[in-house]
Amino acid sequence: MMHRIDPSKLELEERVVTINRVAKVVKGGRRFRFAALVVVGDKNGHVGFGTGKAQEVPDAIRKAIEDAKKNLIAVPLVGTTIPHTINGHFGAGEVFLKPAAEGTGVIAGGPVRAVLELAGVQDILSKSLGSNTPINMIRATVNGLSELKRAEDVAKLRGKSVEELLG
């Protein structure tokens, strides 16, 4: 991530992925709180995720949205899909992302689908490998999306034209 993306300039849509009741065991019993996992995106190449924890669900969601807006990344899109195949990793979670032909749709499960749809990807094939914990799947997906590069960018780095690069 080179520079921070200003969330106030984007029309962000948010999606709650999971809400989890967590407990802290104290002498008098259990203290319950809620942990929320939220994905935000503008469906035009920007996406972020965040977590929030509070005593009430709406507060946890609000905190998660604020956190997600601080963690926005830019996703390079080629038409309605991604530039190339990539594997995203986080912990024991791994997500395989592969570009798809127009009209394929988003073939992804649960948390991965939320990230891809809000990033603006309309055609993609994906497979979740390893850990299926929502937070790990989202982090692995965001990791994969952040490592994507356009052919023009790679050609510029190597000092070649796109035609030379693609052969």
From Swiss-Prot:
GO terms for biological process: translation. Part of the 30S ribosomal subunit. Contacts proteins S4 and S8. Residues 12-75 form the S5 DRBM domain. This is Small ribosomal subunit protein uS5. Belongs to the universal ribosomal protein uS5 family. InterPro entries: Ribosomal_Su5_D2-typ_SF, Ribosomal_uS5, Ribosomal_uS5_bac-type, Ribosomal_uS5_C, Ribosomal_uS5_N, Ribosomal_uS5_N_CS, Ribsml_uS5_D2-typ_fold_subgr. With S4 and S12 plays an important role in translational accuracy. The lineage of its organism: Bacteria, Bacillati, Bacillota, Bacilli, Bacillales. GO terms for cellular component: cytosolic small ribosomal subunit. The N-terminal domain interacts with the head of the 30S subunit; the C-terminal domain interacts with the body and contacts protein S4. The interaction surface between S4 and S5 is involved in control of translational fidelity. It comes from Bacillus cereus (strain ATCC 14579 / DSM 31 / CCUG 7414 / JCM 2152 / NBRC 15305 / NCIMB 9373 / NCTC 2599 / NRRL B-3711). Keywords: Ribonucleoprotein, Ribosomal protein, RNA-binding, rRNA-binding.
